[in-house]
């Protein structure tokens, strides 16, 4: 399954980000806790080499808590500050202010030595499409100051948001790389909804999800759909269609409808708390 998505405006956004980096002290990078590495932009590490870094594991409530902790440790080992959040219900938000101060303590001390008082920390909020940047800013700032939507690429333009006397946020459009070198990355991003569904083969996507769940979360499909997990992936999809009565007008099983239902129930968390990539895979190379 070949997945690619890189609209032209993303190239412009990357150039804009390079300019904006000159203005900021800290990069706050949102990743999806279900796919923390795949939902990172590989350009950000290179572009932000000399900046303080904070990674927010967003939608942590939808992810496997054991893996949340493992990913937190993974990134901390690599020099990042890390906070688990859910920008929709505000979970973890109170922690962020203190972590921002901690991440920028060298900048604050440098200002103090120069006699500069009360200069706010300027932070860039970055992340790939549909990872929850605008919702995070709305929740963090306490008002709907950034346009939100659940379709990739909805956030446009540049906005400075003054949170308080200590912190100003710059919202930037998410950036997705031009080509997925590893097709597993594209697959994972497609499953969490960071790539437009119109350009995807939903049936193939569902089969790949079933294959992963059978291996890493045995029993989860049986519990939800009363199917036998020893079956092949396509047979399991058939069983899900039967369980949920996904039938065409002609009376046949509607595999595409069942596939869409499975993916939707994964994305919404109805299937259970699932993380699609685990840090031990990265440690093992």
Feature map (PLM): residue ranges:
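Helix-rich effector regions associated with P-loop NTPase G domains
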Residues: 1-27, 33-43, 47-53, 60, ...
């Amino acid at each position: 399954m070949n997945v690619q998505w890189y609209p032209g405006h993303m190239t412009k956004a990357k150039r804009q980000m390079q300019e904006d980096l000159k203005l900021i002290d800290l990069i706050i990078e949102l990743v999806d806790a279900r796919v923390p590495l795949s939902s990172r932009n590989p350009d950000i590490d290179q572009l932000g080499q000399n900046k303080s870094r904070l990674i927010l594991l967003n939608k942590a409530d939808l992810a496997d808590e054991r893996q949340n902790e493992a990913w937190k440790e993974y990134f901390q080992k690599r020099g990042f500050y890390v906070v688990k959040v859910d920008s929709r219900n505000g979970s973890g938000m109170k922690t962020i202010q203190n972590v921002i101060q901690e991440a920028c303590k060298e900048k604050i001390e440098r200002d103090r030595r120069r006699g500069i008082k009360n200069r706010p920390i300027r932070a860039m909020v970055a992340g790939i499409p549909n990872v929850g940047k605008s919702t995070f800013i709305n929740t963090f700032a306490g008002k709907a100051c950034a346009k939100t939507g659940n379709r990739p690429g909805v956030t446009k333009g540049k906005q400075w948001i003054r949170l308080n006397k200590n912190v100003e946020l710059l919202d930037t459009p998410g950036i997705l790389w031009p080509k997925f070198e590893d097709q597993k990355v594209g697959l994972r991003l497609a499953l969490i909804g960071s790539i437009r569904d119109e350009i995807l083969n939903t049936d193939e996507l569902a089969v790949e999800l079933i294959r992963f769940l059978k291996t890493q979360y045995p029993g989860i499909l049986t519990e939800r759909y009363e199917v036998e997990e020893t079956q092949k992936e396509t047979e399991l999809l058939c069983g899900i269609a039967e369980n949920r009565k996904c039938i065409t007008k002609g009376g046949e099983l509607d595999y595409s409808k069942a596939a869409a239902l499975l993916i939707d129930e994964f994305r919404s968390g109805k299937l259970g708390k699932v993380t699609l990539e685990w840090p031990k895979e990265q440690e093992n190379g």
